[in-house]
């Protein structure tokens, strides 16, 4: 099936320079429409791969079913697959330069299965609306020459939910108790250790999904 690359020459140029600050809008998995058909557009950077395919429930995890196409000489591979919808599981089947195939979760994925499973999940984040204009405006007025005392904290291990043994606090509850604690202790700022989804809890988030 014919499709067109969604990454322009400017996209690949800025990506190679490391200065494409909206590349997440193109990479990963995005619900899309091609020639009147709804589906999902996939893009991943695998510069040393011989070939890359998309596998998932939709093709019975067959690495040969949906082969991606290289985008110019950028090292990026992409593909539009009709019928792939929100909630579908997927991974990238990467044929290495040595000739063997490995399955990889999406480094730009917006959702993932809960451990110990680790497939990426097609999702839609277009409905999310940032509501931090007031905070950003106030932030611009803050003085930058006043003393700072930063409290570094790992959200997953700072406190556990006493009402649900073994479970983490959600961020809404954590925000209230953590803010009260740091103010009481005299801190002015909080630095959160990695908060991206990660498959191994003891890693503290440094091994991201």
Which residues does each predicted region cover?
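Short amphipathic alpha-helices and their capping/turn segments at secondary-structure boundaries
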Residues: 137-140, 175-186
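The feature marks proteins involved in alpha-glucan
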Residues: 1-37, 41, 71-152, 157-166, ...
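Solvent-exposed serine/threonine-rich low-complexity stretches and specific carbohydrate-binding patches
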Residues: 63-72
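Short beta-strand elements bearing conserved aromatic residues within extracellular beta-rich modules
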Residues: 52-54, 90
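Aromatic-lined carbohydrate-binding/catalytic grooves of carbohydrate-active enzymes
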Residues: 166-169, 181-209
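Short proline/glycine-enriched turn/loop motifs at strand-loop junctions of beta-rich domains
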Residues: 45-52
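Conserved, mostly hydrophobic/aromatic
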Residues: 44, 92, 153, 182, ...
